[in-house]
Amino acid sequence: MSFFGFGPAAELDIALTDGESRRRVEHKTEDGKKEKYFLFYDGETVSGRVTVNLRNPGKRLEHQGLKIEFIGQIELYYDRGNHHEFVSLVKDLARPGEISQSQSFDFEFTHVEKPYESYTGQNVKLRYFLRATLSRRLNDVVKEMDIVVHTLSTYPELNSSIKMEVGIEDCLHIEFEYNKSKYHLKDVIVGKIYFLLVRIKIKHMEIDIIKRETTGTGPNVYHENDTIAKYEIMDGAPVRGESIPIRLFLAGYELTPTMRDINKKFSVRYYLNLVLIDEEERRYFKQQEVVLWRKGDIVRKSMSHQAAIASQRFEGTSHPETRPQHSGAAAVEQEQE
């Protein structure tokens, strides 16, 4: 019996209708490991079958009903007692009664809205899952199955380059340029750095990709910065007039799309952090936000061709007379020790 802690009298199993053919993707779990889950997109139907397997076939099992739920949920780790549901659908599969043998029940959630990307971060988790519940007088029998949702975007209509002149008065003036301000997750960041004035001895220069996760609202806001990548641009002293190319492939890093004010609970933003280190180990940096987005597998050739042309323009050598003009210079910030 299931009485007095001998285990449930039945077990539930959830199987998707297209489980044999549906793609699986790796997704990070809360403990940092990666597991594979079925992949869904916004608007797709979620259908399958719930099977009630009796531990003692032939013995009648009384229940108060069987239901299946599709849930989209945000959990803030500092507020684990509260789960914020932004999608909640339910279907009753069986009325209260008795089951004397294992039995299966079909379900279908049609064209389900899945507005946000699945995400597991430092302080927050956004998950989608199916939950089957066989209600009983003492202990319900529950089975959950997580899925992963990816949000796809179209090519941005406006994707201007980033151009900025930064410096420290009478000591250092540099000009940096990135070919775009919005990159898809498999994109290549192409750019260049041009030294206009060098009067301090720079020994090292790099670009970092920083992910900034912001959770909470009002006085209860938490920020987590995570350096995803470090890309060495230069090891040695630059000279005036020198131009250094940048070519950073994003495909090798664990990135997500930019997420802004998701359900008014959290945001995930990405920054390119230009870091210079002088011979006295002082660090100077300048951050620039970029937008990351996920594109589908099918790429329009015309847009790919335009992207290739844009890339080629930034791979060439820069000359003072052809450099873009700027309306002003921004200050490079010195990092606090």
UniProtKB/Swiss-Prot annotation:
Keywords: Cytoplasm, Endosome, Membrane, Protein transport, Transport. It comes from the Eukaryota. The keyword Methyltransferase does not apply. Residues 311-337 are annotated as: Disordered. It is a peripheral membrane protein. It is found in: Cytoplasm; Membrane; Endosome. GO terms for cellular component: endosome; membrane. GO terms for biological process: intracellular protein transport. The keyword Transport applies. Its main location: cytoplasm. Pfam families: Vps26. Signal peptide: none annotated. Belongs to the VPS26 family. Component of the heterotrimeric retromer cargo-selective complex (CSC) which is believed to associate with variable sorting nexins to form functionally distinct retromer complex variants. Acts as a component of the retromer cargo-selective complex (CSC). The CSC is believed to be the core functional component of retromer or respective retromer complex variants acting to prevent missorting of selected transmembrane cargo proteins into the lysosomal degradation pathway. Retromer mediates retrograde transport of cargo proteins from endosomes to the trans-Golgi network (TGN). PANTHER family: VACUOLAR PROTEIN SORTING 26 RELATED (PTHR12233). This is Vacuolar protein sorting-associated protein 26B.
